């Protein structure tokens, strides 16, 4: 999972063939349900699915805590509604992974209490730097999550794209929404945050550690 250079900070949607910038984070939403999938407890690769669902659940939980911290500081400011809209989508992501945890009997990471505290602290701490700091955090985190989701998509495509079709569609949908949040952060002056390049690199290093640990613990 690489950290993109802050100087250029390209719009990540351009890296996706056929991506359409006009689909905003507040636009049309696609419902994904596990109704006709070939995925069952008997025919899936339990190790792969457990790992994917556990880490994604942890990531969406952490993202929710980050936005909660940002709203605690900036909720009454002009950027509050923007943050709230992104947070609402993250709540939907977390709800879906909560359902998948039950459906596929996946235990959560033992690090949930830690992500609870650190996520809120990261959100509130960067928000104390102002709108730009909060948006820099959003750009860093959402970029990391999008790269992580891309890695999972490659893994499932190599495993069995037909069997995991609906899980693939879900991850792709969430990946696209994270990229939209990334672009919203750039549109709201993330790059004007104090020491933007350093801040982004530190946050993304933390994301890589969190992903590594949540997959395994």
Swiss-Prot record:
Residues annotated to bind NADH: 51, 212, 216
Mutation effect (residue 51 to A): Loss of function activity
UniProt catalytic activity: a 5-methoxy-2-methyl-3-(all-trans-polyprenyl)benzoquinone + NADH + O2 = a 3-demethylubiquinone + NAD(+) + H2O
Cofactor note: Binds 2 iron ions per subunit.
Effect of residue 208 to A: Loss of function activity
Keyword list, A-Z: Chromosome, Disease variant, Iron, Membrane, Metal-binding, Mitochondrion, Mitochondrion inner membrane, Monooxygenase, Neurodegeneration, Neuropathy, Nucleus, Oxidoreductase, Primary mitochondrial disease, Repeat, Transit peptide, Ubiquinone biosynthesis
Enzyme type, top EC level: oxidoreductase
Effect of residue 28 to A: Reduces nuclear localization. Increases level of reactive oxygen species (ROS)
MF term (GO), any: metal ion binding
Location of the region described as Required for nuclear localization in the Swiss-Prot/TrEMBL record: 11-29
GO CC, one annotated term: mitochondrial inner membrane
Mapped Sequence repeat ranges: 48-129, 130-217
UniProt: Fe cation 2 binding residues: 90, 142, 178, 181
Cofactor: Fe cation
Pathway: Cofactor biosynthesis; ubiquinone biosynthesis
Listed CDD domains: DMQH
GO biological process assignments: determination of adult lifespan; negative regulation of transcription by RNA polymerase II; positive regulation of transcription by RNA polymerase II; regulation of gene expression; regulation of reactive oxygen species metabolic process; ubiquinone biosynthetic process
Range of the transit peptide: 1-35
EC number: 1.14.13.253
Quaternary state and interactors: Component of a multi-subunit COQ enzyme complex. Interacts with COQ8B and COQ6. Interacts with COQ9.
PANTHER family assigned to the protein according to its UniProt record, in alphabetical order: 5-DEMETHOXYUBIQUINONE HYDROXYLASE, MITOCHONDRIAL, COENZYME Q10 BIOSYNTHESIS PROTEIN 7
Similarity comment: Belongs to the COQ7 family.
Protein known as: NADPH-dependent 3-demethoxyubiquinone 3-hydroxylase, mitochondrial
Organism: Homo sapiens
Lineage, opening ranks: Eukaryota, Metazoa, Chordata, Craniata, Vertebrata
């Amino acid at each position: 999972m690489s950290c993109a250079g802050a100087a250029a900070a390209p719009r990540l949607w351009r890296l996706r063939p056929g991506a359409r910038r006009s689909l905003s984070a507040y636009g049309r939403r696609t419902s994904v349900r596990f109704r006709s999938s070939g995925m069952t407890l008997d025919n899936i690769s339990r190790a792969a699915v457990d790992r994917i669902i556990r880490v994604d659940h942890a990531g969406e939980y952490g993202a929710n805590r980050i936005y909660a911290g940002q709203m605690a500081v900036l909720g009454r400011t002009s950027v509050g509604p923007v943050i709230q809209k992104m947070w609402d989508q993250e709540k939907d992501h977390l709800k879906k992974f909560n359902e998948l945890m039950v459906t596929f009997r996946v235990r959560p990471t033992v690090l949930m209490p830690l992500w609870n505290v650190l996520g809120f602290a990261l959100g509130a701490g960067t928000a104390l730097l102002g709108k730009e700091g909060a948006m820099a955090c959003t750009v860093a985190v959402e970029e990391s999550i999008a790269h992580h989701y891309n890695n999972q998509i490659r893994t499932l495509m190599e495993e069995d794209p037909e069997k995991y079709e609906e899980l693939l569609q879900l991850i792709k949908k969430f990946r696209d929404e994270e990229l939209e949040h990334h672009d919203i952060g750039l549109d709201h002056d993330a790059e004007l945050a104090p020491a933007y390049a350093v801040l982004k690199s530190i946050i993304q290093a933390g994301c890589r550690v969190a992903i590594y640990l949540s997959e395994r613990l």
